[in-house]
Swiss-Prot record:
Catalytic activity: N-(5-phospho-beta-D-ribosyl)anthranilate + diphosphate = 5-phospho-alpha-D-ribose 1-diphosphate + anthranilate
Binding locations of anthranilate 2: 165
Alphabetical GO biological process terms: L-tryptophan biosynthetic process
EC class of the enzyme, as a word: transferase
Keywords annotated in UniProt: Amino-acid biosynthesis, Aromatic amino acid biosynthesis, Glycosyltransferase, Magnesium, Metal-binding, Transferase, Tryptophan biosynthesis
Cofactor annotation remark: Binds 2 magnesium ions per monomer.
EC number(s) on file: 2.4.2.18
Protein name per UniProt: Anthranilate phosphoribosyltransferase
Residue sites binding 5-phospho-alpha-D-ribose 1-diphosphate per the record: 79, 82-83, 87, 89-92, 107-115, 119
Length: 242
């Protein structure tokens, strides 16, 4: 089936939500070759991912992830990365600061793939154990107000795409859908996005996926952050309206 979906993409056609769901399931089950995964990621990047594709991919990720129970007031600060600016990991610093103010943060993150520093890289350099179990993460969230959810532990099936992602090096759809698949199922987030166009797509995708209040920020200088060197565009999803 994946060959048929690849052929459809090669013709410049977009996948339906169900087709995207099926493609991601094939990847996560280990049935896709590295070449097939790299081909799909490259074609999607060149054409531009649609909202239907994003929703289908995220649904598949959520269905296979190891989730943790969390209260409705938990938030996440996460970015797409891949802006090429080599800035420090702002979302991790922001998570630490706001948790000290009493906000519960389930910080979802990974090591760097298409950027210089991921949140896991930062925390490891600080001497923090990132390989915490779901039960330990849940307890930390309840007692300390901050937990780090290391993506490979909660999205174990994504290991099949790790090699192709690293080899091709550029940002892919995984940069976009990672922030949408928090294991704590956060419905409130601040998401840094490297493109306002994609911020709007992600807002619509998260609306369809049930998020309640999400801010998507994009610096006009290309940062997936609130920029201090240029104006910042903000796309807000709140109570079903964008």
């Amino acid at each position: 089936m994946l060959k048929q979906l690849l052929s459809k993409c090669a013709e410049g056609k977009a996948l339906t939500e169900d087709e995207a769901y099926a493609a991601m399931n094939i990847i996560m089950s280990g049935e896709a070759t590295d070449s097939q995964i790299a081909s799909l990621l490259s074609m999607l990047r060149l054409r531009g991912e649609t909202v239907d594709e994003l929703v289908g991919f995220v649904r598949a990720m959520r269905d296979r992830m190891t989730a943790i129970e969390a209260s409705d007031d938990v938030i996440d600060t996460c970015g797409t990365g891949g802006d090429g600016a080599a800035t420090f990991n702002v979302s991790t610093a922001a998570a630490i600061v706001i948790s000290s103010l009493g906000v519960k943060v389930a910080k979802h993150g990974n090591r760097a793939v298409s950027s210089k520093s991921g949140s896991a890289d930062v925390l490891e350099r600080l001497g923090i154990d990132i390989h915490t179990s779901p039960s330990a993460a849940k307890q930390a969230l309840e007692t300390k107000g901050l937990a780090f959810l290391f993506a490979p532990l909660y999205h174990a099936a994504m290991k099949h795409a790790a090699g192709p992602r690293k080899e091709i090096g550029f940002r892919t759809v995984f940069n976009l859908i990672g922030p949408l698949a928090n294991p704590a199922r956060c419905k409130r987030q601040v998401v840094g996005v490297y493109s306002t166009c994609y911020a709007e797509k992600l807002a619509e995708a998260m609306r369809r996926l049930g998020s309640e209040h999400v801010l998507f920020v994009t610096g006009r200088d290309g940062l997936d952050e609130c920029s201090i060197a240029a104006e910042t565009d903000v796309v807000e999803l709140k109570d079903g309206a964008i």
